[in-house]
């Protein structure tokens, strides 16, 4: 699991609330042992931004151990991260809660966690290529779920059902009936562009500019996504596909869909996290990704849908902007 913590608030682990089936009180918080320092370094430090300093730890033991690390972020704010370490032979350690909010067991791995302005954790799963998922306030949203890309395969039946699924456009690497069916039950709402709804014979059509509220505190807006370079317009024509902006209690994520830099990007407003496609000739070149990022100015940029594109120089080209390159999003 990858974790990125932003705008954190304090809470308390020592209230007898457990995770992974563990109940009972935590021990009194004290200094970290060498073993606990190693756990923190292995499970938390590589995946947490901003960098956290663990000051104390308390424990809760039963069929494994919960370690509640009491930390400080660079601004001096208190942050609590719970790591569950199972008994030998029962899997590896994992982060199970942040600031008292438990993370779902049946949510895809390879995820990051951001904290919204209300102090709630927002989990972002980087599944592969253009497939993403969000978990917030008990709701799960999937974007362009696809079961297979080349040798990469995902069994979506292993995950919990989605509350909503958003499809950007009807290309095979974004629209997959098998994945949609695996994630859906009678409560799942499907949103897509008109071509995808026609292909699936189900779903609610969203056109550029449409917006709505999925639940209290979760809003969505469909935004333009299209090619502009001469000769590429055939791949993604203007007005056909969508990008999406998701607003989670003020934390705004931009999922660009398949697009090149377009004028509309300058009108998106404040963006905390942006997913931009880098896969020429269908979407952006690396230099176009830089151009788009400079139009949007996200706090964090994650290139996705990038296939074999070499992204190693991208962070250097966007100094002052946090750039995360995630292998699964090829």
What are these language model-derived features?
Residues 228-295:
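Active-site-proximal loop/helix segments of hydrolase catalytic cores
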